[in-house]
Curated annotation (Swiss-Prot):
Compartment(s): Cytoplasm, Nucleoid
NCBIfam families in alphabetical order: PRK00321.1-1 (NF001460), PRK00321.1-3 (NF001462), PRK00321.1-5 (NF001464)
Function statement: May be involved in recombination.
Recorded GO MF terms: double-stranded DNA binding
UniProt-recorded name of the protein: Recombination-associated protein RdgC
Family: Belongs to the RdgC family.
UniProt GO cellular component terms: bacterial nucleoid; cytoplasm
Organism: Photorhabdus laumondii subsp. laumondii (strain DSM 15139 / CIP 105565 / TT01)
Entry keyword set: Cytoplasm, DNA recombination
GO biological processes: DNA recombination; regulation of DNA recombination
Pfam family, one: RdgC
Amino acid sequence: MLWFKNLMIYRLNRETSLSADELEKQLSPLAFTPCGSQDMAKTGWVPPMGSHSDAFTHVANNQILICARKEEKMLPSPVIKQALQAKIEKLEGEQHRKLKKTEKDSLKDEILHTLLPRAFSRFSQTYIWIDIANNLIVIDAASAKRAEDNLALLRKSLGSLPVVPLTFKNPIELTLTEWVRSGALPTGFALMDEAELKAILEEGGVIRCKKQDLVSDEIATHIEAGKCVTKLALDWEERIQFMLSDDGTFKRIKFSDTLREQNDDIDREDFAQRFDADFILMTGELSALINSTIEALGGEAEK
């Protein structure tokens, strides 16, 4: 079981009936297929349990897990540039004239056509958790672009997907700043030793703190000078540690050993049972964390 390291959270903005059976049928036409000789990249759905299952959905406790795989051909631009330059110089020498831009572009296409079949591939997988009970879609992605790319694939499979990023009533950075300034956090949350502070004015500086007592005179001085906390490392219930950003994303999630060991009594040889138990455990904890964080930050913005 791959435990999520990041949470990009989206709210389904109207009642949408997502059933696992229907989803299985909808994902199937866009199953992952490897790049052909002339493809730069291909993306599609794969079973979340890998070789242990043929199903494109894993379902437990009203939660659905799906997985997208992407293959990208690696063609470093210096390699293309070097091959193109050699070709241009050769032709210009033979024809005793400078090549036009359209001719150079055509040569570049020829080079790509020649190099692509020999290019190495890079593979990546992105897990998407559909929380039907709470009407959320949560993506394990570290960047908004990667999350949006995978949402686009899901939207293509479903036909439509009415989602919006999870947004809050109050600016997150003001709440985080107050937590650091006062040292008083909502029940269940505790400050760690890492944060990022930014000046409100764009031309102002950025302070990144690591292994730092955040409730200190030094940090207080930065806050008094007009800086806001835009990223803050937090501990929740001594079960999950994470970095909360001012855009509402959770990154660098780390589950406590105590939490991860809860299912150690299940035989690891029984992959399906352990995967299922870990998925139920992870989604239960993350659902509680998300709900606690929403409440701690003052609630969601009005729909």
